[in-house]
Amino acid sequence: MKFLPYIFLLCCGLWSTISFADEDYIEYRGISSNNRVTLDPLRLSNKELRWLASKKNLVIAVHKSQTATLLHTDSQQRVRGINADYLNLLKRALNIKLTLREYADHQKAMDALAEGEVDIVLSHLVTSPPLNNDIAATKPLIITFPALVTTLHDSMRPLTSPKPVNIARVANYPPDEVIHQSFPKATIISFTNLYQALASVSAGHNDYFIGSNIITSSMISRYFTHSLNVVKYYNSPRQYNFFLTRKESVILNEVLNRFVDALTNEVRYEVSQNWLDTGNLAFLNKPLELTEHEKQWIKQHPNLKVLENPYSPPYSMTDENGSVRGVMGDILNIITLQTGLNFSPITVSHNIHAGTQLSPGGWDIIPGAIYSEDRENNVLFAEAFITTPYVFVMQKAPDSEQTLKKGMKVAIPYYYELHSQLKEMYPEVEWIQVDNASAAFHKVKEGELDALVATQLNSRYMIDHYYPNELYHFLIPGVPNASLSFAFPRGEPELKDIINKALNAIPPSEVLRLTEKWIKMPNVTIDTWDLYSEQFYIVTTLSVLLVGSSLLWGFYLLRSVRRRKVIQGDLENQISFRKALSDSLPNPTYVVNWQGNVISHNSAFEHYFTADYYKNAMLPLENSDSPFKDVFSNAHEVTAETKENRTIYTQVFEIDNGIEKRCINHWHTLCNLPASDNAVYICGWQDITETRDLINALEVEKNKAIKATVAKSQFLATMSHEIRTPISSIMGFLELLSGSGLSKEQRVEAISLAYATGQSLLGLIGEILDVDKIESGNYQLQPQWVDIPTLVQNTCHSFGAIAASKSIALSCSSTFPEHYLVKIDPQAFKQVLSNLLSNALKFTTEGAVKITTSLGHIDDNHAVIKMTIMDSGSGLSQEEQQQLFKRYSQTSAGRQQTGSGLGLMICKELIKNMQGDLSLESHPGIGTTFTITIPVEISQQVATVEAKAEQPITLPEKLSILIADDHPTNRLLLKRQLNLLGYDVDEATDGVQALHKVSMQHYDLLITDVNMPNMDGFELTRKLREQNSSLPIWGLTANAQANEREKGLSCGMNLCLFKPLTLDVLKTHLSQLHQVAHIAPQYRHLDIEALKNNTANDLQLMQEILMTFQHETHKDLPAAFQALEAGDNRTFHQCIHRIHGAANILNLQKLINISHQLEITPVSDDSKPEILQLLNSVKEHIAELDQEIAVFCQKND
């Protein structure tokens, strides 16, 4: 049973909670206030009293945006805070029940007021009452001011700054323009939470915070007591807290205003002080009671000049901007909030009281002035608001006594009123007047003074901050306390009355709090420069004068030393320069005195001789071992003219440098020495040994060139004769053949002789080309396994007719082992043998020519071929043998025969390339023997040489051949040769015409001259290969050099043949094309099967369709290009559509795809490059189709 009451209470609580959950508000259970402040009874009218008696309960709405300092709930759901204390006072003053409801936001509370659910809305802090015709606002219950906050350690930061700073705020209060008035370059960071904003300043992320003084001070008191500090209050924009009622609730509004009026500044201060440790400005809620005259004076004097002493902490200090700080700075800040007066500081360097001597209007107020009856005649004093005792300051020592001793030096500021009194109390002490007490602390610490008279607050601050372990203070007995107040010019009694009213409104506790705040303020630095600047300037001036005079004396002493050093340096520089200049010369130079001794030389002189022979070079020139003994044989005979004109004597001779004799061009000249009567010789030489050798070598080469020119002229004369002779014979035979008087046998003989003469002419040209190949290094040997006896026998057999015609016995014998092969180039070996055999038969008129061949073994795989060619001809003298193997040279007997004089030279070089040797033995009138020895590899396999039956040459049928040559005769000859072989031939006069014909018609072979106008054969071949043409191409050239053939093959020719082109050569190469005629043409793009199906295999109709397609596309495509360029989109699409349609009929897939892409691509400036690319693709594709159409039409004619 004992648990029933608790169960009942729990159920009631749950029911009430559920009921609150169904509403838009939470109803508080009461007001919790421990404030014992009482108000005087309100003077209410009978009507107001009757209304309150009938009302009995006032429902007041608040909302969650109220800060904890103003209103918050405890664990019992009772409200606490500054507003709660005011509501508790309202409850007691009106003797009425109050019901508090909390709404989610301000708007819902106002809606409840409008609907009559509540009687009053207690607003949050706003800058002005709401503008609503249905709502009435009372006088402000709370007034707050913007507060500037920074870190405790940086409390002396300037209160205004043009520099960039970071400033935090909450909910955009205060506005940007207000902040920028003091900090024009501020970066403003807005927070939604006050704690985060203050924490950002404490952590150093921001420099300042600006916000409401009540809320900010409450948060600092709770969480940032030791890190943040309020350094200034601003007069605007202020924030207010109102009671809001309905417009018709006139009586309620009047009652609430009477309550607000009853809240004196003292009551407000006491209520706020219960919640704030600092920043309580509640005593400013009601303005000062100023007379109209005082208000008018403030309007006329809004700005006042303040004489400020920066060296009187904690009363008065300045920051870097010169603003007044310290206790007096905070008091002036409060007076500004009370009166609107602005204070401009004027700094006094030494003694603030000296300001009283300024001219009238030079100052308006002195803060922190110590009252003195003597000075009251000059200035007005406000009522004292700080009193502090006087103290003695002395050095701290173990045996320190709190008294003054005889003979002590004691400093006292001259403006202290107890100066005369202390002199009477301590006559044995030496009293020293000072301008400033703060500056004298350091002198006491240094022992310059024994004691100092100061106020207790000033002494406490200075010792605690600067001399905690060096100084201490004690009270001066029997003297009155110092009274601090404000001083004014005697002509400003109104200002005195205004300041007195403002000071009286400040609670004494607030003055004590400000004093304690600055005494405990850390890290405040006092700039004492002005106190010591005069002494510093005096000492500095004397030091500068002393240093300057010393420097002048030093300069005077060092001037002569420097001058000597400069002269010495110039001399050393000249010597060094001359030495470097001499050593940098590539040619040797040296100096010889009048006695002939070498007194100086450069490095090239020393390096020219060997180390041992250098000693001889340094000997006097008269010494016989000196290499220059002949230089000065007449040196002393130099005339006066030589001395004046500096004539340079040169002579060329040879000297020994220790290794060899060198030829030099030596020079010398005379140099007079002005400082003495003596003279020296400056000498040198240039080595011209190489130059002399080069000139000699050039002379030799010049003679060789002259001889070569003569030999070449002789060769040209010989060659012109050798070439002219067979050409004349050919022309003579042709002339005979053109007539009709020859019989058939004579004609055959004439043709045969003309052909043989032409072959000899080709052989002559071949010899010249062989020489060029050999000398250029392009002749390549191609060794093969060869049966040497058989090769020699066949070669001899070919010369049998010539030997028989001259009745010369030609024999060929061999001791070669049977069944042996040797590895050798058969063509080169045969050429050597043929040349030597031809010469032997040429120069032998009777007798015999013998050829013997043998093989000398070296080992199993190597041997040496030895072959001799012996004739019984005219023989050669020794002089002729010396010239025999030289180019273009012929013997006297040879010049009587035809020949180029190159044969033996070619033989010599070919044998040399085969690592062999060619020698001769000859005697005039007896004969000549040539001996050849060639090292070779041998094979012991059985050699089987079978005569291969000549394979019949099979020529291809139906070849379509194109000839390109600019020479009509060459085209006619080649065309007749091909016609003779049964082929149809087409002609082109240059490469351009040939390229066009190939593009329009199919050919199986192109034979082109390499040298043609407009486009030569090489360029024609490159163009065709760039079109991926596989057409066989033969090049024809009259230039028989190998590089010409290589050039043709490199540009893509299949063959490069040399003119003249014989029928046998043509047959041989044409036989390799025998498969061409049997290969069916391949079509990459034409669909022949589709064409056959659409035309019932009618070849004529197929050709007509293809020719029509070719004709129409060649009209439409250029028209499309022109339309695109002109911007005629309609014509452009018509042309493309026709091409697309024709491609569909012939089933040309690639052309279908490209034309379709062109049709669907919109024509614009952006797409124009893409369309041009597609049109070029169509153009290239149609060119390929033209070739295939030409092939089809040609094959089906």
Curated annotation (Swiss-Prot):
It holds the Pfam family HATPase_c. Residues 347-537 are periplasmic. Residues 1-21 form the signal peptide. Keywords: ATP-binding, Cell inner membrane, Cell membrane, Kinase, Membrane, Nucleotide-binding, Phosphoprotein, Signal, Transferase, Transmembrane, Transmembrane helix, Two-component regulatory system. Activation requires a sequential transfer of a phosphate group from a His in the primary transmitter domain, to an Asp in the receiver domain and to a His in the secondary transmitter domain. GO terms for biological process: response to acidic pH; response to metal ion; signal transduction. The modification Phosphohistidine is found at H721, H1137. PROSITE patterns: HIS_KIN, HPT, RESPONSE_REGULATORY. Residues 22-325, 559-1197 are cytoplasmic. Residues 960-1074 form the Response regulatory domain. Residues 718-938 form the Histidine kinase domain. Residues 1098-1197 form the HPt domain. It comes from the Bacteria. It is a multi-pass membrane protein. Member of the two-component regulatory system EvgS/EvgA. Phosphorylates EvgA via a four-step phosphorelay in response to environmental signals. This is Sensor protein EvgS.
